[in-house]
């Protein structure tokens, strides 16, 4: 079950003008609970004014068994991200959920692979953990990172990436692409999009060599990168995406759902609670929270999968899904923040163990 614990901030380190890395001290009794797969995220919770805010941030590293770190980049209008950058200090305590998320990769010591990461801006955060863990665990594996930023000054983890390159000079290929800073090669100037990746494919990179590809950054970049990799011959099952938000994406349900008055049974911590939806409820999660249920959630945008549950009976309509894998969908898992009941006998189980 997803659980929050109060963790003390061990240190806050600036990465760029707009970004910081926050490291939490994890007590020995909780270290197993905060063991993570590279690529997963933490959900942080705080109250600002009268509002409870929850936000997901990717785990960037775990430098010691008793520490775990996330990176936060302040964004325009982002109450939590600006609070994190400006107000969170060492010694403060924050409510932190145990690691969650489907994105990422668990390195295997015996495996020899070729991996690709495509990131832009703060999308580097989960990649740093994945790349570092993979190269240290799989001694014969190789990683290529294509990383886009406005300039070298806005580049998060610049020193950490340089250190990784020094440590694994033959096994890590790092390509930095800047949109507002010209380097010697025009190939490394501009934005990461389909045209840029096609140009790299013609001159520098054989994209068909990679066993797995990981993509994280702005939605348009991710969509372009995914489509281009498929066009270049990479199997869809080998392409993994992590979206931080769905801004600019408008989603409409495929079917009209009349959920007002519908009752849904929510199973959590071994107990069943019956909730009734109103016309104002946009999802099963909204209805349950309104009626006092303390369910796990964070983004409410279909991205983080924190609110994942399993449909035990009945049918639901899920408006959108940016996080569940096909095998999870086939097993009956849905995102409660995106789901409404289609039948009158729906039971959803938040205790069901998901697929890692």
Regions found by a protein language model. Name each.
Residues 2-93, 97, 110-113, 149-151, ...:
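Ferredoxin-reductase
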Residues 3-8, 258-265:
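Short structural boundary motif marking the start of a folded domain
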Residues 63-66, 108-113, 138, 341-350:
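Ligand-binding loop in jelly-roll beta-barrel domains
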Residues 83-257, 263:
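FNR/FR-type flavoprotein reductase catalytic core
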Residues 260-296:
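C-terminal accessory/binding modules appended to enzymatic or scaffolding proteins
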Residues 289-291, 306-355:
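Iron-sulfur (Fe-S) cluster-binding segments and ferredoxin-like electron-carrier domains
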């Amino acid at each position: 079950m997803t659980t929050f614990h109060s963790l003390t901030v061990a240190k806050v380190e600036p990465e760029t003008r707009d970004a910081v890395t926050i490291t939490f001290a994890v007590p020995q009794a909780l270290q197993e609970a905060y063991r993570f797969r590279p690529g997963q995220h933490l959900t942080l919770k705080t109250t600002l004014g009268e509002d409870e805010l929850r936000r997901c941030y990717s785990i960037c590293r775990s430098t010691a068994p008793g520490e775990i770190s996330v990176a936060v980049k302040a964004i325009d209008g982002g109450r939590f991200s600006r609070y994190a950058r400006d107000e969170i200090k060492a010694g403060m305590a924050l409510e932190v959920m145990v690691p969650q998320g489907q994105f990422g990769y668990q390195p295997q010591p015996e495996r020899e692979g070729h991996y690709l990461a495509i990131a832009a801006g703060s999308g580097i955060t989960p990649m740093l953990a994945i790349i570092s863990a993979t190269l240290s665990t799989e001694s014969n594996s190789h990683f290529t990172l294509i990383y886009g930023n406005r300039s070298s000054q806005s580049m998060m983890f610049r020193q950490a990436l340089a250190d990784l390159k020094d440590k694994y000079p033959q096994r890590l290929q790092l390509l930095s692409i800047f949109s507002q800073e010209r380097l010697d090669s025009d190939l490394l100037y501009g934005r990461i999009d389909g045209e840029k990746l096609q140009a790299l494919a013609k001159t520098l990179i054989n994209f068909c060599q990679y066993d797995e590809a990981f993509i994280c950054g702005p939605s348009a970049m991710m969509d372009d990168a995914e489509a281009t990799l498929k066009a270049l011959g990479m199997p869809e099952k080998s392409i993994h995406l992590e979206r931080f938000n769905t801004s600019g994406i408008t989603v409409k349900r495929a079917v009209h759902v009349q959920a007002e008055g519908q009752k849904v049974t929510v199973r959590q911590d071994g107990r069943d609670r019956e909730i009734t939806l109103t016309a104002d409820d946009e999802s099963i999660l909204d209805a349950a929270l309104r009626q006092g249920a303390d369910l796990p959630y964070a983004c409410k945008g279909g991205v983080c999968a924190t609110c994942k549950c399993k449909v035990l009976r009945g049918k639901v309509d899920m408006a959108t899904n940016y996080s569940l894998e096909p095998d999870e969908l086939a097993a009956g898992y849905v995102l409660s923040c995106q789901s409404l009941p289609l039948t009158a006998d729906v039971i959803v189980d938040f205790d069901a163990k998901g697929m890692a």
